[in-house]
Amino acid sequence: MSVTLSRKLIDYVKLAKPKVVSLLDVVAIASYILAFKGNWYNLIPVLIGGSIAAGGSMIINGGLEIEKDKVMKRTSWRPTVKGEVGRKEAYMVGGIACALGSLIGLLANPLTAFFILLGSLVYVFVYSYYLKPRTWLNIVIGGFAGSAAAWAGYAAASNSFNLESLLLGLLVFAWTPGHFWALALRYKRDYANAEIPMLPAIVDDKTAARAIAISNILMIPFALGLMLYLNLIYVIITLAATAVLLYFNVRLMRNPTPEESWISYKFSAPYLAIVMIAAVISFIL
């Protein structure tokens, strides 16, 4: 019995995409610190609740996309594809996790719980269920799911939603398309075979590479908008990180290969973490 339970837990963790959740946690922590009002206790429920709810959303996503995951080499290993976690089981476990995570958020305040729940609802219903199989705008609009992590973290510390909080969320929103389009270009054939209309799967490689670069350029005003609240340290670190990101994007435009798109993708996740850490350093100093 213990072996079976252990196996199940491992399957759920795989479906929960811990790397994605950990990046959302970085966003939530940074947002919490930027809104810090002298109370560290609320960081615990927003981190635990947000992580559980985000993981639950990913598990539901695994149940929704079994057929598509089967034809994609990148996702063919998932427990839902192998039959180790059934569709209804994924819905049930994921749904419970989303509800539990939102309830834990209440230990901070109702606004935190609202944003945790909002993130789950946007990811599951708006992005995964409705937009992803229908339009290339899927990840553009779906980026608001990540924004909710910033808003939840900020709300947990301050019980408020203001311009600074909005900018943090919009930064994550604007970062999302370029990040996931780089991944989709790397696995373009997978997405095409699964009939998922990610932008790189429905346009030529050069157009996709330009779209990635343009998306990241459009992100810059949101990143620099935080200058209203932070000092020169944030500006210097953010500009340096952005220069590196755009350098990889230029390389990708010149040579739109799977290898170059993978390099852009692999840097874009640390990029967001770097910007968030820069914001924290700037705030503290």
From Swiss-Prot:
Transmembrane regions: 16-36, 40-60, 106-126, 136-156, 165-185, 217-237, 265-285
Pfam families given in the database record: UbiA
One of the GO BP terms on file: heme O biosynthetic process
Record's keyword annotation contains Membrane: yes
Compartmental location: Cell membrane
Sample GO molecular function, one term: protoheme IX farnesyltransferase activity
Keywords recorded for this protein, A-Z: Cell membrane, Heme biosynthesis, Membrane, Transferase, Transmembrane, Transmembrane helix
Gene3D superfamilies listed in its UniProt record: UbiA prenyltransferase
Family matches, as HAMAP family: CyoE_CtaB (MF_00154)
Similarity field: Belongs to the UbiA prenyltransferase family. Protoheme IX farnesyltransferase subfamily.
Protein name in UniProt: Protoheme IX farnesyltransferase
Biological source species: Sulfolobus acidocaldarius (strain ATCC 33909 / DSM 639 / JCM 8929 / NBRC 15157 / NCIMB 11770)
Encoding gene per record: ctaB
